[in-house]
């Protein structure tokens, strides 16, 4: 699973547009 933690609290609505921290668990 891929988990993306955006730097901005509202960024979840704009994930394709922001630079997010991405964590890959279990590939």
Curated annotation (Swiss-Prot):
Presence of keyword Chloroplast: no
E.C. designation(s): 1.15.1.1
Note describing how the cofactor binds: Binds 1 Mn(2+) ion per subunit.
Catalytic activity from the UniProt record: 2 superoxide + 2 H(+) = H2O2 + O2
Keywords from the UniProt entry: Manganese, Metal-binding, Oxidoreductase
UniProt cofactor(s): Mn(2+)
Top-rank taxon, per record: Bacteria
Subunit structure: Homodimer.
Family statement: Belongs to the iron/manganese superoxide dismutase family.
Described function: Destroys superoxide anion radicals which are normally produced within the cells and which are toxic to biological systems.
Protein's UniProt name: Superoxide dismutase [Mn]
Gene label: sodA
């Amino acid at each position: 699973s891929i988990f993306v933690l955006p730097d901005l609290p509202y960024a979840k609505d704009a994930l394709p547009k922001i630079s997010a921290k991405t964590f890959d668990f279990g590939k």
